[in-house]
């Protein structure tokens, strides 16, 4: 079982090679879950949008993974926080 599907899903000016790797990982995650790749990508974007309203994230260290066992599939997000933003 692959323990980490997504490594640094954010693009950080590393070019199209990193983009291709990110998309491939989404496809692999799709193959192992009932969610399609575009839904997974949209979930990732929306999660980050909401969390970013409250904290500044270390975008170079973000990790998303999907773990599946016989009973469930879990989306796991590792979102390192640089600092907490002031009240909105």
Swiss-Prot record:
Keywords assigned by UniProt, alphabetized: Cell cycle, Cell division, Chloroplast, Plastid
SUPFAM superfamilies, per the entry: Cell division protein MinE topological specificity domain
UniProt gene name: minE
Subcellular location: Plastid, Chloroplast
Protein name stated in the entry: Putative cell division topological specificity factor
One GO term of the biological process aspect: regulation of division septum assembly
Chief localisation class: plastid
Presence of keyword Cell cycle: yes
Pfam families given in the database record: MinE (PF03776)
Function summary: Prevents the cell division inhibition by proteins minC and minD at internal division sites while permitting inhibition at polar sites.
GO cellular component: chloroplast
Family: Belongs to the MinE family.
HAMAP family on file: MinE (MF_00262)
Organism of provenance: Guillardia theta
InterPro entries according to UniProt: MinE (IPR005527), MinE_sf (IPR036707)
